[in-house]
Amino acid sequence: MSRIQPVRLPEPDQPLSGKEVIAILRERWSASYDLQLLQRNGRMYLQVMWAYLEQQTFPLSEADYRLGIERVVRAVNAMGQANMVRRWLRTSRD
């Protein structure tokens, strides 16, 4: 008699938090890079910007930077893309 292997269903997206995203950015690239969501031709893109919080010429205060990251994170969570973004931030070769 053959054994039936259980099917592993994908886990629902656990929401991202601003703190988690900032921690991933710092761990991955050793800097708190800014993020932006961009819509082009009906598609959404998450961009890691060249500017980062620790840079002397960074135009935002730390509080404003964190608010901006939280805005991006809320949008990503609302689209149900938390796991995809989490995985991309951790594994991207860019």
Regions inferred by a protein language model and the residue ranges of each:
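N-terminal organelle-targeting presequences
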Residues: M1-D94
